[in-house]
């Protein structure tokens, strides 16, 4: 079975799985959260986050390879660090998926209502639109997980085409005075203090760790293909993010982000700022298509993951009745939160970053340290000895401190 998987899938497939998982609607939060730090410091902290998340992923892979193919994250966590940490990990995974579902309901409501308003002249209520999109996605998941996967794949293909058209155009229109913030009233001020408030969102932008067990099922224990998938998949995401920052911060002045942030920082506000740069009709159309598809594909991906996680957690069967129960568990809590607090996209992504710090940063580092003691002759060990796990844990603690510093208004905020 493993040999057939190795022949069937090249490392390119794994690279696309990793990159496709992390690149989505969450990328709209990056320029908003990094507006204070602006391009050069923003790029710097994004690279730091990529380095740390790449190595936490490799540490998770290191621990995973000591167990039979198909072993779940729960199995490995329980065996190496005990049931208490396994429960903590399970709670954080569920919270991350729930908060991301809420964030994408919010983003869908905002961007689709804005698209309707711009093209049809009808001002749709974002809350109603958000709930309607949630009902649509819930209906698809109730019918079939395969249908949701196929729709996500279709959206991904269209998203790539529209991305190339739109940002190929914006790339050649970058104004270096805007990129350097030379014309701003705040030009010359320090950008460095603003990097800390963006750390949780930068971390959440590289959350591919849930795919590692799936990659091992696909490739078996061919560590060369697994390592290439993780390294080049996350590196591709980093390059696209840097390109995205270059295009956004080279076209939209830093001062304009204050209005975006004050309006809640949702996807529609950023898109309207892009449209204010006076683009041709085809570029405007492709920008709207890309924005809608980026959010929609992430929404399908996250809710599919949450649906499967809850079905496994509560041992709910795959009948229509069972799937209906799982759909209710998946969508009701975030939908109710959305009705109470509709403009929570940025806060949702940041909150996901906090919880992802535990299960995707700190726990993988601890698992690798424990695995090295339990399996001294393991087949793969991340370079750097115990220094790399220590750096990863330090990064995780820093992100947690920054998140709380942001919540309690200790850190400086832009806007």
UniProtKB/Swiss-Prot annotation:
The chain crosses the membrane at residues 12-32, 34-54, 87-107, 128-148, 154-174, 192-212, 230-250, 287-307, 327-347, 349-369, 388-408. InterPro entries: Amino_acid_transport_2, Trp/try_permease_CS, Trp_tyr_transpt. GO terms for biological process: amino acid transmembrane transport; L-tryptophan catabolic process. Residues 33, 108-127, 175-191, 251-286, 348, 409-415 are periplasmic. Keywords: Amino-acid transport, Cell inner membrane, Cell membrane, Membrane, Transmembrane, Transmembrane helix, Transport, Tryptophan catabolism. It is found in: Cell inner membrane. Residues 1-11, 55-86, 149-153, 213-229, 308-326, 370-387 are cytoplasmic. One of its GO terms (cellular component) is plasma membrane. It is a multi-pass membrane protein. Induction: By tryptophan. Is subject to catabolic repression. One of its GO terms (molecular function) is aromatic amino acid transmembrane transporter activity. The keyword Cell membrane applies. Involved in tryptophan transport across the cytoplasmic membrane. Plays a role in transporting tryptophan which is to be used catabolically. Belongs to the amino acid/polyamine transporter 2 family. Mtr/TnaB/TyrP permease subfamily. This is Low affinity tryptophan permease. It comes from Escherichia coli (strain K12). The gene is tnaB.
